[in-house]
């Protein structure tokens, strides 16, 4: 028997994020569904107060993991324009889509044609008009420069070495002055022999060298091992 939701309330810190409280006292993150009745990755849908909410699983989304671990600042609001590098099958972009709403836009870059097709089926074909799908390689932003206009936030979640460099290169092309970047550091994708903390420092230093002010770093355990989320602003 499923556990009933007894309360839905706005998150105390982050715009467009909600807390679902269940009858057993547990709480889960959620966003308000931009396309009611439609799921992206099998998530629970909850109707409350005339709206529908999608449970946001921190084991499936690095951004949800960062929020669950107490990140203080997420630079995403209604109307925010985002460049998302490494969109995969669309779990986190779909929740960003809920948050930014119809005035926002998410340019979603994915390299794998197979995964890109899945992204199209789950997001674009389901009516998320604020998502712009781009089949491309995040290492070469000039290849999709004609698709992307200036963005407020550049976000990266790719299993590549030089993750911070890839993000900074894209920021040089597309980030508005004073814009923000969000870097998911996957330590094992960069150097399997080095301690994760050393890899985190290395990637953070790359951002600093490229002119970014580091605002916050949050480790993502227990949801993802040897991962961290970094939020920075272009000086």
Curated annotation (Swiss-Prot):
Sequence positions that bind S-adenosyl-L-methionine:
91-92, 110-111, 137-138, 157-160
Q: What class of enzyme is it?
A: transferase
Alphabetically sorted, this entry's keywords are: Methyltransferase, RNA-binding, rRNA processing, Transferase, tRNA processing
Residues in a coiled coil are none
- List, alphabetically, the InterPro entries matched: Fibrillarin, Fibrillarin_CS, SAM-dependent_MTases_sf
Q: What Pfam families does the entry give?
A: Fibrillarin (PF01269)
Any single biological process term in GO: box C/D sno(s)RNA 3'-end processing
Enzyme Commission number(s): 2.1.1.-
Please give the Gene Ontology molecular function terms for this protein: histone H2AQ104 methyltransferase activity; RNA binding; rRNA methyltransferase activity
UniProt function note: Involved in pre-rRNA and tRNA processing. Utilizes the methyl donor S-adenosyl-L-methionine to catalyze the site-specific 2'-hydroxyl methylation of ribose moieties in rRNA and tRNA. Site specificity is provided by a guide RNA that base pairs with the substrate. Methylation occurs at a characteristic distance from the sequence involved in base pairing with the guide RNA.
Q: Subunit arrangement?
A: Interacts with nop5. Component of box C/D small ribonucleoprotein (sRNP) particles that contain rpl7ae, FlpA and nop5, plus a guide RNA.
UniProt lists the family membership as follows:
Belongs to the methyltransferase superfamily. Fibrillarin family.
Please identify the protein, giving its name as recorded: Fibrillarin-like rRNA/tRNA 2'-O-methyltransferase
| Gene source species | Pyrobaculum neutrophilum (strain DSM 2338 / JCM 9278 / NBRC 100436 / V24Sta)
Q: Which gene encodes it?
A: flpA
